[in-house]
């Protein structure tokens, strides 16, 4: 304010000298006007400085907002139907862990062991690969469960599922893709059935369908299955195998004997009953079907996890992958090979076998290139352009190079349910790799 400015001088008039008074008055007036102009100029400069400071502040805020908006950039979301490869949904390259379960009793110390944590750091690339395969499995089965309904052709269900896997896993030869044919076994057929080309089987309301499919990255396999039934009368049958599988997973661990897991599974499975069309059945574990260890490019790596008591005394070991799967049946609880074969797999330990048929040699080269020791089905051979191959395929089977896996069936008229997860016995904990929100 001007009244507070120290530049304004107040001088008393001199009465004796009128000229001096007049001169002094003019000087005082000039000084006063000059002071006012200086004050106005200073005030203007302050306002300019304030405006510039305000602009600078606004500019900084805008930059911060821009930076914040960049940080808040959302990750891509999966489409419906799914079409975006999972590698694009996780640009960091790190894929979600499965469900972590701590070891118990004598192995509880592993949870906090620095030495064991260091071992896990070395295995991180493998863990990440198999987690990527598991994430694909979760997203594909979520979609398939939402679209499957009575009246669909089994071939359409399988091809929709398999094509979705190919997209989401970024299929790339033997580096990434489908690990084995889509099993969609119905009712008394427990496993290893998929439609061959031309099959016209239609899914019915009263069917019990086991959807068993696999994904892999660099041969690291996720083997995971679930059962679909539209009629609620089958709910207890599905619950039996689901809870039995959870029990098997809970019991599994480093140094656990395989026979103990089987006994625990059977106890839970056979505690269930199911009423079908007015008749009550006790659910039975299928005694000649098992879970199994998994190796790179090897779906059955040598160890079997029984689902009844009285199995092997062999122990599970650190670092192993296992498919824990259970089958509950209203039939005899025993399967046999039946129906037309669709599943085949090159024997993992097959050495060089001389082949006489040129067509068999050609087919073997195709199998080596496209599947190696991963399982395949006739539809997959059709898809890559193979024709008139049945005689050559039989020759490869007869020579012991390729193993056929016909459908496995309980008694006709019975119903079988299945649930399965892949687990990893890490040095510090047990990871249920394929676990999802659904099961």
UniProtKB/Swiss-Prot annotation:
CDD domains: MetAP2
Single Gene Ontology MF annotation: metalloaminopeptidase activity
Documented EC number(s): 3.4.11.18
Keyword terms, alphabetized: Aminopeptidase, Cytoplasm, Hydrolase, Metal-binding, Protease
Annotated region (Disordered), positions in chain: 1-90
Biased composition (Basic residues): 61-73
Amino-acid positions noted as binding substrate in the UniProt annotation, renumbered to this chain: 192, 300
Entries under Pfam families matching the protein: Peptidase_M24
Ranges of Basic and acidic residues composition bias in the record: 24-40
Record's GO cellular component terms: cytoplasm; cytosol
Catalytically driven reaction(s): Release of N-terminal amino acids, preferentially methionine, from peptides and arylamides
Regions of compositional bias (Acidic residues) in chain numbering: 41-51
Binding site for a divalent metal cation 1: 212, 223, 420
Cofactor binding annotation: Binds 2 divalent metal cations per subunit. Has a high-affinity and a low affinity metal-binding site. The true nature of the physiological cofactor is under debate. The enzyme is active with cobalt, zinc, manganese or divalent iron ions. Most likely, methionine aminopeptidases function as mononuclear Fe(2+)-metalloproteases under physiological conditions, and the catalytically relevant metal-binding site has been assigned to the histidine-containing high-affinity site.
Top-rank lineage group of the source organism: Eukaryota
Localization: Cytoplasm
Obligatory cofactor(s): Co(2+); Zn(2+); Mn(2+); Fe(2+)
Residues binding a divalent metal cation 2: 223, 292, 325, 420
One GO biological process term: protein processing
Expression by tissue: Ubiquitous. Preferentially expressed in roots.
Stored PANTHER family: METHIONINE AMINOPEPTIDASE 2
Family: Belongs to the peptidase M24A family. Methionine aminopeptidase eukaryotic type 2 subfamily.
NCBIfam families linked to this entry: met_pdase_II
Free-text function comment from the UniProt entry: Cotranslationally removes the N-terminal methionine from nascent proteins. The N-terminal methionine is often cleaved when the second residue in the primary sequence is small and uncharged (Met-Ala-, Cys, Gly, Pro, Ser, Thr, or Val).
Protein name: Methionine aminopeptidase 2B
Organism of this sequence: Arabidopsis thaliana (Mouse-ear cress)
Gene it is expressed from: MAP2B
